[in-house]
């Protein structure tokens, strides 16, 4: 979609060499907006994905920090939320959403495909 392409262009402009946005369309989620922020290590961003029912997931990208601490692929649950994370092309990434929501679980399965 045009909106997804616009979010990708915005991300490419702000994060040279970063991986492309995760394709979560097979789970019904499309990127709809993004926010740029800063960390001690440099620019970071959050991209919001939404499905046709209005459910949302958040995608985060940030630099790894001074020690260049890259993450192995993994997941972590905290209360009602689950984060699935990985590293690539010099950045750390995460997708965060409701842990027990079937739509979010379908998105997690889509993430397991090569990114």
Residue ranges of each PLM-predicted region?
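Polar, acidic low-complexity tracts enriched in Ser/Thr/Gln/Glu with frequent Gly/Pro and Thr-Pro motifs
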Residues: 1-115
